[in-house]
Amino acid sequence: MGAPPGYRPSAWVHLLHQLPRADFQLRPVPSGFAPRDQEYQQALLLVAALAGLGLGLSLIFIAVYLIRFCCCRPPEPHGAKSPPPGGGCVTWSCIAALLVGCAGIGIGFYGNSETSDGVSQLSSALLHANHTLSTIDDVVLETVERLGEAVKTELTTLEEVLSVRMELVAATRGARRQAEAAAQYLQGLAFWQGVSLSPVQVAEDVTFVEEYRWLAYVLLLLLVLLVCLFTLLGLAKQSKWLVVVMTAMSLLVLVLSWGSMGLEAATAVGLSDFCSNPDTYVLNLTQEETGLSSDILSYYFLCNQAVSNPFQQRLTLSQRALASIHSQLQGLEREAIPQFSAAQKPLLSLEETLNVTERSFHQLVALLHCRSLHKDYGSALRGLCEDALEGLLFLMLFSLLSAGALATTLCSLPRAWALFPPSDDYDDTDDDDPFNPQESKRFVQWQSSI
């Protein structure tokens, strides 16, 4: 099948499409896009479950590390004031992990924007395709109504005026038959009329889902950013309560990061399967939803020399009918106007109607060509399979970096918390120091007693 203009499956699509797939019984599953197939659904769920496995391993590792830290820590000498060896390394490793998490947040914002741009391009292509289809229906309807009105008024009036000349009446009736035939041929060109599938509704649904997806990721990114910043603040101020709160928040964000990674991985794999060969699935789905013939859908989705225009015969017959009407009207003008002055007005009106109809016909020929709708199809595929897929991969990288950074932070924070000086150390000051809080309090009491 011919690829749409400007679209070629990217290297990421080929790479993800080649990954093996298996169902819950670990049996191989074909990589063709089949979202309604139960085995294919299980394969995507299994891809998402790999993130759950990563979360479980992370939690087990963190738990084992903290248990070892709590149970196997050597006792500190009584009255020791100096920090244990390796304390600075622990703090700096925690800070480095948080900085990596902040870098991942920037990657996440970029990926979220790329995904949103791709979905917006898909919605714009759907809206433009709907405009083309609606214009075809409107032009056909206006042209058919214009020809019908001409048959009812001008041609009927012309027959009455020329009733005494049977050969002129016959020519007028011939023009009537050709006008009715042209209207019938043109009416069959409005192929989208009465179809239940609305590209506008699809675009609105896609935009609605994308708005909430974008907002959810922005909130997740901001949450990760706040956790990283407040954790760094807690380490800088050596605030135990802030570190404890951020430890709990880090655990929550760790779960969210792995969860988002599973969703992103399953979506990216499914999207790569679709983008590797989109024509077959889109053609079958559109035929199922619209009931249109495969000839029409193949013409617009493939748009190559191997597929002929299914409307070519109707267009040719319509053009011949209009040319025949034009020829008959010219003959009537030569024969009827010199003898019947009352025939001039309906003939001029018919000539004007025919000129407008021919202009509409040429516009209809351009609209029915596969080039415009096929261009929209290619634009939709580029938005979905290039920008959106690239954004998903950047979001996966963000989730991986944030999960790794938060796992390292959860291992480091308890050790860093243990290195903080106790609150009693702040009261170990000289009694004669004027900046001593106790001395300042006594000074205020003495001043108030004077």
UniProtKB/Swiss-Prot annotation:
Disulphides: C275-C385, C303-C370
Essential for the formation of the channel-pore, annotated site positions: R165
Report, as the record phrases it, the tissue specificity of this protein. Expressed in the astrocytes (at protein level). Restricted mainly to neural tissues. Strongly expressed in brain and eye.
Carrying Phosphoserine, the residues are: S440
| Membrane topology, Extracellular segments | 1-43, 110-214, 262-390
The residue spans the entry assigns to the Cytoplasmic side of the membrane are as follows 65-88, 236-240, 412-450
Summary of activators and inhibitors of this protein:
Inhibited by (4-[(2-butyl-6,7-dichloro-2- cyclopentyl-2,3-dihydro-1-oxo-1H-inden-5-yl)oxy]butanoic acid).
Q: So where does this one cross the membrane?
A: 44-64, 89-109, 215-235, 241-261, 391-411
User: Known post-translational modifications?
Assistant: N-glycosylated. Contains high-mannose, hybrid and complex oligosaccharides.
Membrane topology term reads:
Multi-pass membrane protein
Print the keywords alphabetically: Cell adhesion, Cell membrane, Chloride, Chloride channel, Disulfide bond, Glycoprotein, Ion channel, Ion transport, Membrane, Metal-binding, Phosphoprotein, Transmembrane, Transmembrane helix, Transport
- Superkingdom of this protein's organism: Eukaryota
- Subcellular location(s) per record: Cell membrane
Q: Which reaction does it catalyse?
A: chloride(in) = chloride(out); L-glutamate(out) = L-glutamate(in)
Glycosylation-annotated residues: N130, N284, N355
Renumbered to this chain, region (Disordered) spans: 428-450
- List, in alphabetical order, the GO biological process terms annotated in this UniProt record: cell morphogenesis; cell-cell adhesion; cell-substrate adhesion; filopodium assembly; gene expression; L-glutamate transmembrane transport; mitotic cell cycle; neurogenesis
Protein family? Belongs to the tweety family.
SUBUNIT field: Homotetramer; disulfide-linked. Homodimer.
- Provide the protein name: Protein tweety homolog 1
Species annotation: Mus musculus (Mouse)
